[in-house]
Amino acid sequence: MNLCTDQLAMLVADDEQLISVSALAADPLNSAMADQAEKYPLNHGRAEEIHLLDPGLVVTGRFHAGPTVDMLRRLGIPVVVFDPANSLEAIRENIARMGEVLGQPGRAAEIVRAFDQRLAMLKAPVMRPLRAALYFPNGYTRGEQTLLGDIVRTAGFANIASDAGVRTGAHMPLERLVLAEPDVIITGSRHDGKSRSENILQHPVLETAARWDRAHQLKTSDWVCGTPQALAAVERIGALRGTLMGGR
């Protein structure tokens, strides 16, 4: 019933262990495992529909740990709550925990080993980090104590949000972003149709940066959840750093 824990469960579980995943898990804009999610009945995270599925266990994220989880527990359904991963290390921990919860510790350990091996290949010595701005709808940015912040750091960039004292997430005025003079501006996937919250991403400042190869869209599904797919974001941002350094 949660986008991120659903993906962890699909990674670790046998097919017959899962009876339903959330509709968001089948949304390719947000889910790196949308195709796999379509194999299962979809739910919308409501206690009534979850109860009718008669699950032996529900796994969900901390952001869902509210009235729905309370109701499920009152109905006698065990619920395991996961904290969202705010770092690459936390991804490893959540995979291992999901393996224990679903009785698949060996499979989880294999996934963690593969994760570690790929991460080691992507970590390159960085003599001088370039500076990146993370900028999203409504002028929202993410700091170093977030998964995306850790991804950017691992790929060899310093996050300008740190200079503004942002550790998790906050609004950043466009003027402050411009004055910071980042080497690159990283944004997320755009939704179909026009959203008022995304208007700021069409500002001439960002469009000019894009024309000069200084603004790049990162697939939201790569980093919005703490799964091994986050390493695809590390790889893409690392390649971007190589391109920028090659032009100097």
Language-model regions: role of each:
Residues M1-F63, F157-I160:
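A short, structured surface patch at a secondary-structure boundary
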Residues T5-L11, A26-S31, Y140-E144, T187, ...:
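Short, solvent-exposed loop/turn elements at domain surfaces
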Residues S22, P28, L147-G169, R214-Q217:
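His/Asp/Glu-enriched short active-site or ligand-binding loop at hydrolase and phosphoryl-transfer sites
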Residues Q36-E48, A85, G165-L174:
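Short helix-initiation/N-cap motifs at beta->coil->alpha
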Residues A47-D54, L75, H171-E181:
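Short helices/loops that flank or line small-molecule/ion binding pockets
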Residues A90-E100, A109, V184, G188-R248:
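Structured C-terminal subdomain patch of bacterial secreted/periplasmic proteins
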